[in-house]
Regions:
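Domain-level signature for soluble enzymes in the chorismate/prephenate branch of the shikimate pathway
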Residues: 1-304
Length: 304
């Protein structure tokens, strides 16, 4: 997403098996998703979550409401944000020459404290990506203008780093999703499944009912968020990520129960997780599931 030097490009570079694919840089998340929907590209790669700012709602909402894509994998990368400008513009000790700061809105939000204390009078302008902000300064030779972008962007576009690591929190990471149509990758043994469950109107305890399906099967949730459905005030859906793959019997049974009871469930994919099992709690094993299923079948055979 965007020109060279984006964090999206950096995240893709960590996936050597994708090097055979021809990258098609696009300006924004909606453009990427539209290109995938139209068949102009085979895969889309977009940010979905940041450790500081939370969900990238433009991606989340598009997957929940606008497109029928399936997640192929997730990629998590560390994010360092630097302040950069034309060489000689400013130093870390003297930022007075900087009157405007350009960057992607999410990156700007991740540097609120620095901007508030170090550049309180600077005008903040949004760009469609961090790299595009850096490229614009380099190509247009904008004096007195700084960009917030990756260290790589400074090298690519001939800018000088004025201040490094200006993000509010050092443990800053962004999660990206690889998307495709009509395909689910096979189980890897370390997987996540992502779904959207639309709340039943005027039904008390609907969220509790959803959560109980996971608790009953000892399936751990790694993410739970609510989003307005766009259908009216007070109407929400729940976006859930949880451990396991749709080919696992216990996961399939959970999805079956949710579909039966909640009715409106959207499957976003089962895919390799970027990190290992963080809960420490073992889900119900396939062996235990098969054994209990065989036991139940033996009891049913007694019915005459």
């Amino acid at each position: 997403m965007g020109p060279r030097g984006t964090f999206t490009e950096a995240a893709l570079a960590t996936q050597p098996d994708l090097s055979q694919c021809t990258p098609v840089p696009l300006i924004s998340v909606p453009e990427v998703l539209s290109a995938l929907d139209d068949g102009a590209v085979d895969y889309g790669f977009v940010p979905v979550e940041n450790a500081i700012e939370g969900a990238v709602n433009v991606t989340q909402d598009a997957l929940a409401f606008d497109f029928d894509f399936l997640i192929q994998r997730e990629v998590v990368v560390n994010v360092q944000l630097d302040l950069m400008a034309l060489p000689g513009t400013a130093t870390a000790d003297d930022l007075t020459a900087i009157h405007t700061v350009l960057s992607f809105p999410v990156a700007i939000a991740q540097c609120r404290a620095f901007l508030h204390t170090q550049l309180p009078d600077a005008e903040i302008e949004a760009a469609t990506s961090t790299a595009l902000a850096a490229r614009r300064i380099g190509e247009e030779q904008l004096t007195g203008v700084a960009a917030i972008a990756s260290p790589t962007a400074a090298e690519i576009y001939g800018l000088e780093t004025v201040a490094a690591g200006i993000e509010d929190h050092r443990e800053n990471q962004t999660r990206f999703l690889l998307l495709a149509k009509n395909q689910v990758p096979p189980a890897s043994g370390n997987d996540k499944t992502s779904i959207v469950v639309f709340q039943q109107q005027n039904e008390p305890g609907s969220l509790l009912g959803i959560l109980m399906e996971f608790e009953a099967r000892r399936i751990d949730l790694s993410r739970l968020e609510s989003r307005p459905t766009r259908r009216g005030l007070g109407e929400y859906c729940f976006l859930l990520d949880f451990e396991g793959h749709i080919s696992d019997e216990v996961v399939a049974d959970c999805l079956r129960a949710l579909k039966m009871k909640q009715r409106d469930v959207k499957f976003l994919g089962s895919f390799p997780a970027a990190n290992g099992n963080s809960s420490g709690r073992e889900p119900i094993s396939e062996e235990a599931w098969t054994s209990s299923d065989d036991w139940l079948k033996s009891l049913r055979r007694l019915v005459r």
